[in-house]
């Protein structure tokens, strides 16, 4: 009886425990997608804190279901840090829709201005020091912290509360009175971070702008006198008259761009395009360009909409032991250096009228004494503060204190009479200006109106995994090599090398974000791009539902057929069909297979038909993980022999799905990887597919795991992994041609040295035999790659909106292989011999020997392999010697038989050299059968060639054509 009572108690207790239980996978996905439970109209508020592991947790900070009643409403709410000890914010995930929210600011402080669920921000943000940790603006990319970088919170000096401020601009989206739960999800860790984030504020305080069209430059410069800081993001800020704001590091007279942006575009933090480090003795310089057009009076620096501001916020990190959390620069200590400022700093960035950000500031008060505005400080040009002061001055960037009234309230009676007073005045001006930005819901037209401007200057990155690179002390230009360039030169075997085709004009096409490239049966290049649509942090909600449906489909042709020689557009299609194009592949019949991550669908298109898709897989705008749904599918591969369809499904589901040629679901495999050392068959964004028909394999670019996985198409059995340290942490795309595998990686993470580049690999061994980069422009996010069988390679970049063409430096006819014809077998077999030798000797020494042999044997301009030349010279000599011996040895009566045998024998040899003949000498099999040589690692030479009839048995064929076992994953 006692046992029964115990069991009853357990049953009563356990259900509640089961409700709260979450598997590690669900916790991971929950943080990735959302950290709150949604119900009815709005996100719930039941579980703001979600454990990730023993040291990390997610904190969800969201509005508790609010409905603004008038435009330009600012709501604030607070969440207490769920711990007293020190922690570090290492990532931010915005949870806002551009249709409802204009911008969001996240502050840290020790006492919020109110203890209610939410309040009007007119009441203030915090009653003590407030620091800005995060800023999000519509149509702008989210702020990302590099790996190892964190903002300090908690502990003795850090903030105890987070305060979220949300600005609702145009409230027409709330006509249905729905509730809004916009906010931000934080990823925090208890582990000390080696690098601490901070802010450097450059601000002009004495600029005077006369009325009229005269250009006025407001210059700021300071000597940097601290430990090195590494810049990774920036934000510009002016009012209506600002045309462009530019920031630079000046070292030994050399100007290095930190950031340049129009202040009339969304004023969030943007990543620096190239890493910049600032060391002791450098000069930091900034210029704001103004005109007084439309004004009838002189304009000064101040806090109302009639005044102006010139601010550049530089977000940086420093080593923890030397970290200074906040620094300021408010003077121009080196005015002479601006004589050599790059001309770009003086060129306004044009912004269409429908793209201008409206600034809803308080109008100038009638009794305002303009002469009492901020005056030139009489302090050291650069102030450095410790942790506590950092929070005080960070609040001045965009925050509020208890005495702050909504939007740019400026008290002219409070003159700056001392250094501390001046800094306080600056703080009030900065924080209150940003509270006043308003919105007129022009978002849909902003991107559409000037696509190139938005794409090139705002959306320089596409997904959160595109982390920022380490800062380096160099000036980068389009023609200069990137960090780490050329480090793979010793690995070039000379066997295959590609270089950019500098005479190809296609690099200047500049379509939208290039998501896919492929080659049609006529060898024309086909580009799949996003037009004026972009994929950024605002595109999807936490459940992967597309949030910008109101923009409508892309109103321009998204599929371009390009002449491979002169880059002329031969054909275009795909208008008003897609929202966010992603993958593109072309089957043997020339049909296009495309994916759209917003629609969560796969389409089969006939390029010659205008009747719509031939086949559609998935449900429009409905993410899911069953047999009838996808969730942001990335790529498609179609088996040329069977017509079987393979889909990589993709960003959310981490699986591969197989369909019949008619679109019937067959099977799926794969799962999400949560560990640092993922297992075979686990994925973190299966991003690109490449079929290897001769071997019956499907290879997958496992993007976020930085590797390539190959599987058998019939059994789905894992075959091998290809992973190299030079890949870095991402492999975005792959392409296969007989014997070779091409790939492109992604932008390196913080402290990683691997550059963004393309790779050529021996498919059998997986060894890298060449790397390549463009000369014109540079890779930023190479998103897809396509290779033709003559060795021409095309790479499309989603950030630079560029397509490059690379060609082989060899005579490609010696490596050409026809899809449905006779191959030049002797070339393939000679390569097989070389590959076999390379497997049996150390790679480095063997590569040297191969290079030396090729140098000795090759004549200038010749690409003929040494083995081929030797074969062509030796065989006729052997045949002639054999004939002479037979003539001398045989009598005249036996001569006829000998002649017939010789004729048959020589016919087989010469026939083999022509790639014909059903039997005879097979150099690959001959050498592979000799002691000391292994057949393992050979490529299947052809599916149509006569060699296939010579396979002795199934087991031997399997050994010859299976890939080697996966090598141990390198530590990272």
UniProtKB/Swiss-Prot annotation:
Pfam families: Cu2_monoox_C, Cu2_monooxygen, NHL. The keyword RNA-binding does not apply. Residues 495-817 are annotated as: Peptidyl-alpha-hydroxyglycine alpha-amidating lyase. Ca(2+) binds at residues 517, 584, 784. Gene3D superfamilies: 2.60.120.230, Copper type II, ascorbate-dependent monooxygenase, N-terminal domain, TolB, C-terminal domain. Residues 1-494 are annotated as: Peptidylglycine alpha-hydroxylating monooxygenase. PAM activity is inhibited by EDTA, phenylglyoxal and diethyl pyrocarbonate. PAL activity is stimulated by cadmium and inhibited by mercury. Binds one Zn(2+) ion per subunit. Binds 2 Cu(2+) ions per subunit. This is Peptidyl-glycine alpha-amidating monooxygenase. It comes from Bos taurus. The gene is PAM.
């Amino acid at each position: 009886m006692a046992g029964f009572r115990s069991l009853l108690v357990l049953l009563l207790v356990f259900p509640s425990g089961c409700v709260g239980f979450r598997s590690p996978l669900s916790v991971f996905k929950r943080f990735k997608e959302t950290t709150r439970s949604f119900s009815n109209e709005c996100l719930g508020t039941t579980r703001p804190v979600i454990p990730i592991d023993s040291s990390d947790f997610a904190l969800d900070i969201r509005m508790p279901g609010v409905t603004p009643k008038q435009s330009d409403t600012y709501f604030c709410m607070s969440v207490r840090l769920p711990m007293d000890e020190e922690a570090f914010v290492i990532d931010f995930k915005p949870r806002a829709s551009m249709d409802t929210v204009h911008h969001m600011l996240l502050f840290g402080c020790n006492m919020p201005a109110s203890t209610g669920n939410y309040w009007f921000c007119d009441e203030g943000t915090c009653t003590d020091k407030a620091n800005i940790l995060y800023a999000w603006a519509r149509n702008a990319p989210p702020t990302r912290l590099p790996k190892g970088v964190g903002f300090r919170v908690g502990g003795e000096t850090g903030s105890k509360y987070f305060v979220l401020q949300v600005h609702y601009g145009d409230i027409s989206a709330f006509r249905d009175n729905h509730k809004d739960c916009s906010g931000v999800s934080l990823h925090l860790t208890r582990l000390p971070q080696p690098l601490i984030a901070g802010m450097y504020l450059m601000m002009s305080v004495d600029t005077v702008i006369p009325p009229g069209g005269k250009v006025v430059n407001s210059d700021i410069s300071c000597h940097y006198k601290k430990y090195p800081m590494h810049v990774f993001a920036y934000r510009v800020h002016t009012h209506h008259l600002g045309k462009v704001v530019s920031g630079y590091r000046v070292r030994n007279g050399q100007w290095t761009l930190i950031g340049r942006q129009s202040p009339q575009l969304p004023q969030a933090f943007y990543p620096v395009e190239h890493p910049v480090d600032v060391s002791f003795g450098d000069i930091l310089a900034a210029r704001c360009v103004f005109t007084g057009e439309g004004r009838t009076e002189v304009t000064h620096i101040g806090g109302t909409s009639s005044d102006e501001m010139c601010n550049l916020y530089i977000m940086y990190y420093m080593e923890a032991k030397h970290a200074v959390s906040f620094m300021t620069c408010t003077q121009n200590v080196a005015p002479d250096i601006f004589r050599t400022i790059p001309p770009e700093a003086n060129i306004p960035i044009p912004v269409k009228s429908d793209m201008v950000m409206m600034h809803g500031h308080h109008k100038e008060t009638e009794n305002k004494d303009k002469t009492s505005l901020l005056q030139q400080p009489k302090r050291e040009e650069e102030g450095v503060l410790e942790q506590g002061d950092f929070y005080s001055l960070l609040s001045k960037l965009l925050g509020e204190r208890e005495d702050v009234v909504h939007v740019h309230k400026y008290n002219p009676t409070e003159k700056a009479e001392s250094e501390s007073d001046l800094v306080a005045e600056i703080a009030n001006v900065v924080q209150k200006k940003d509270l006043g930005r308003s919105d007129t819901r022009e978002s849909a037209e902003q991107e559409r109106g000037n696509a190139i401007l938005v794409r090139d200057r705002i959306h320089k990155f596409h997904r959160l995994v595109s982390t920022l690179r380490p800062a380096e002390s160099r000036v980068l230009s389009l023609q200069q090599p990137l960090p780490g360039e050329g480090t793979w030169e010793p690995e070039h075997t000379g066997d295959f090398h590609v270089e950019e085709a500098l005479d190809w004009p296609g690099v200047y096409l500049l379509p939208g974000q290039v998501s896919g490239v492929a080659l049609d049966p006529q060898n024309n290049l086909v580009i799949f791009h996003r037009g004026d649509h972009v994929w950024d942090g605002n595109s999807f909600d936490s459940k992967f539902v597309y949030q910008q449906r109101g923009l409508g489909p892309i109103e321009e042709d998204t599929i371009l057929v390009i002449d491979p020689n002169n880059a002329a557009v031969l054909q275009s299609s795909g208008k008003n069909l897609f929202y966010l194009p992603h993958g593109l592949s072309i089957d043997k019949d020339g049909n296009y297979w495309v994916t759209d991550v917003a629609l969560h669908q796969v389409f089969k298109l006939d390029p010659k038909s205008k009747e719509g898709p031939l086949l559609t897989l998935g449900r429009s705008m409905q993410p899911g993980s069953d047999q009838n749904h996808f969730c942001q599918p990335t790529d498609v591969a179609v088996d040329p022999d069977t017509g079987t369809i393979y889909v990589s499904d993709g960003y959310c589901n981490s699986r591969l799905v197989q369909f019949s040629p008619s679109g019937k679901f067959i099977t799926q495999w794969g799962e999400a990887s949560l560990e640092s050392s993922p297992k075979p068959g686990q994925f973190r964004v299966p991003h690109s597919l490449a079929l290897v028909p001769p071997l019956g394999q499907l290879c997958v670019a496992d993007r976020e795991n930085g590797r390539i996985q190959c599987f058998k198409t019939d059994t789905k059995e894992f075959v091998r992994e290809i992973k190299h340290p030079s890949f870095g942490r991402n492999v975005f795309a792959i392409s296969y041609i007989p014997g070779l595998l091409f790939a492109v990686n992604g932008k390196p993470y913080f402290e990683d040295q691997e550059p963004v580049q393309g790779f050529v690999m021996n498919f059998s061994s997986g060894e890298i035999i060449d790397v390549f980069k463009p000369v014109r422009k540079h890779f930023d996010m190479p998103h897809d790659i396509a290779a033709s069988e003559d060795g021409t390679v095309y790479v499309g970049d989603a950030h630079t909106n560029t397509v490059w063409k690379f060609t082989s430096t060899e005579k490609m006819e010696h490596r050409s292989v026809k899809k449905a014809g006779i191959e030049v077998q002797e070339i393939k077999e000679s390569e097989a011999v070389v590959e076999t030798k390379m497997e049996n000797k150390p790679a480095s020494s063997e590569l040297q020997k191969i290079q030396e042999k090729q140098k000795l044997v090759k004549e200038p301009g010749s690409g003929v392999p040494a083995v081929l030349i030797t074969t062509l010279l030796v065989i006729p000599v052997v045949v002639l010697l054999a004939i002479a011996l037979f003539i001398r040895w045989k009598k005249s009566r036996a001569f006829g038989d000998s002649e017939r045998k010789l004729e048959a024998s020589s016919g087989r040899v010469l026939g083999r050299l022509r790639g014909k003949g059903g039997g005879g000498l097979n150099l690959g099999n001959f050498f592979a059968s000799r002691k000391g040589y292994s057949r393992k690692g050979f490529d299947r030479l052809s599916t149509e060639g006569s060699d296939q009839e010579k396979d002795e048995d199934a087991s031997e064929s399997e050994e010859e054509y299976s890939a080697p076992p996966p090598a141990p994953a390198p530590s990272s």
